[in-house]
């Protein structure tokens, strides 16, 4: 009987994993041909010029946190760097984390997680940036993360429409924009040369753990009982041109 129960559980898990794989969201990340981008503030204009469309971060995965700010993002790459642009409207904003690798997820925060091809299934990178441009970069598996050092962090160009100084929570509706230029060299656990034709997986998030109205939104849906973004099993497919 125990053997049959184990077989049934295994079949169920295989079916669920297969359904998840077939249901994975997909994003094509176009290559844009620009010389070195000297400032992240240029990114929105570049993506406008290249007609890169916005995607919504709109999955509310946990009914205990129903608030859904308006969040859009778009992504492209230059070969040796990923360009990200977020546009967000929410009830309040906060940027208390004053240093890189701080608790930016407690602030108004936009995030990008990615698993590189050929890496171990449980390993992935997380790039988390608050609305004042403070950045956290981590790598490894859930519960065993290594933070990036000063050089990979400094290599990421950031721009926020709210400036770069920390501030306490500001109440009232606020629309803000964030842009990042993430070079291949900031993937500090790899000797990554470029993103050309890369087939990766990942997810895009918006959170604010300590805002007056906490929220946890994702681009690709997450089927877990409690808020958790560190879940590569629910990443979508990322196709780099």
Stretches found by the model and what they are:
Residues 22-241:
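Structural preference for beta-rich elements and adjacent junctions enriched in aromatics
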Residues 7-23:
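Short, Lys/Arg-enriched N-terminal segments with co-localized hydrophobic residues
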């Amino acid at each position: 009987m125990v053997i049959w129960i184990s077989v049934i559980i295994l079949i169920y898990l295989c079916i669920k994993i297969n359904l998840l794989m077939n249901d994975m969201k997909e994003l094509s990340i176009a290559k844009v041909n620009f010389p070195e981008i000297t400032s992240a503030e240029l990114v929105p204009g570049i993506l406008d010029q290249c007609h890169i469309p916005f995607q919504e971060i709109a999955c509310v995965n946990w009914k205990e946190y129903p608030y859904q700010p308006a969040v859009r993002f778009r992504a492209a790459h230059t070969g040796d760097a990923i360009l990200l642009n977020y546009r967000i409207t929410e009830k309040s904003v906060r940027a208390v984390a004053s240093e890189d690798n701080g608790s930016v997820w407690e602030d108004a925060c936009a995030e990008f997680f990615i698993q590189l091809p050929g890496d171990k299934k449980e390993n992935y990178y997380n790039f988390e940036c608050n609305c004042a441009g403070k950045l956290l970069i981590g790598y490894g598996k859930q519960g065993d993360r290594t933070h990036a050092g000063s050089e990979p962090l400094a290599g990421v160009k950031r721009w926020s429409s709210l400036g770069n100084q920390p501030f306490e929570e500001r109440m009232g509706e606020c629309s803000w924009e964030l842009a990042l230029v993430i070079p291949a060299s900031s993937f500090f656990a790899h000797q990554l040369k470029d993103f050309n034709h890369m087939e990766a997986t990942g997810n895009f998030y918006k959170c604010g753990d300590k805002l007056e109205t906490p929220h946890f939104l994702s681009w690709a849906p997450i089927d877990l009982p409690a808020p958790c973004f560190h879940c590569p099993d629910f990443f979508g497919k990322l196709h780099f041109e």
